[in-house]
Amino acid sequence: MVVAGAADAIVPVGSSARFYAAYIPHAEVTIFPGDVGHYVFLADCTEAGRATLPALCLDAPSVDRDAIHAKTTDLAEAYFARHLR
């Protein structure tokens, strides 16, 4: 299972998620659309983190980090249920 954000400017989807998935048996790729970037998959930051490292902590206004985390969890659970028998 490989997940990535369509707006990832750190590691572009074409040279990372899709590239690596081509070499991973049974890989399933999910690209979150829109403004989902590289750091959205990190845990929520504290106030101090947002003040110190805003690039890691602040997402585009259209991105709901908690929703991305929940969807990624659902995808992982389903993937492992199918492939770890």
Q: What is each PLM-predicted segment?
A:
Residues 2-8:
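Short beta-strand/loop motif that positions the catalytic acidic residue
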Residues 12-22:
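Short alpha-helix in the alpha/beta-hydrolase fold that links the catalytic acid
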Residues 22-58:
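Catalytic histidine neighborhood in serine/cysteine hydrolases
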Residues 59-70:
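Active-site rim elements
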Residues 69-77:
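Short, amphipathic alpha-helical "lid/cap" segments that border enzyme active or binding sites
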Residues 76, 80-85:
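Short, hydrophobic alpha-helical segments
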